Amino acid sequence: MNKSLKANPQNCSLCNLCALVCSKVQVGYSDPAFSGIRISHELPAALKVKLTYCLQCKQGYCIKSCPYQALVRDEQGIVRLARDKCHCTEIRPCVEACKFKAIYSVPLWQYPIKCDMCQGSPRCVQVCPSGALRV
């Protein structure tokens, strides 16, 4: 069984704590641009929140597209990026291959960004004050 995040966008308070803590884990400092989870919303009609993150899908389009085999699925079903194998620079096939738009390319950053479930204990779930995220 694939372990992945589950979201209830209706509970999201738009506090952005999940993105801040995720980026801290991913790159060492808090900047939502480097987060594996993205929050978007539509205003003004009705507040509609969308949370985008890697679903650890069974299809593994990103894995298949990587010319360096830098994306691998572990024994828990979590797709992880082996940074030492990732040699893509400007063109990142995994970003384009993801049907869910859940792998992100950040300018001037050497690796794609995606949710890797924080080694099985997602920090975003731990810090979410509204219970919008769970495993």
Pin down the residues of each PLM region.
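Aromatic-flanked redox-active Cys/Sec active sites in thiol-based oxidoreductases
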Residues: 9, 83, 130
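N-terminal beta-strand motif that seeds the catalytic metal site of vicinal oxygen chelate
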Residues: 2-7
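Short Cys/His-rich zinc-binding micro-motifs
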Residues: 12, 56-57, 86-89, 115-119
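Mid-chain, well-packed structural core segment of small domains
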Residues: 76-83, 87
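Iron-sulfur cluster-binding cysteine motifs and their immediate structural context
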Residues: 17-38, 61-78, 92-109, 122-135
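Conserved positions at the start
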Residues: 51, 112-115
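Short, structured active-site "lid" loops
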Residues: 46-60
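Intrinsically disordered, low-complexity segments
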Residues: 37-42, 46
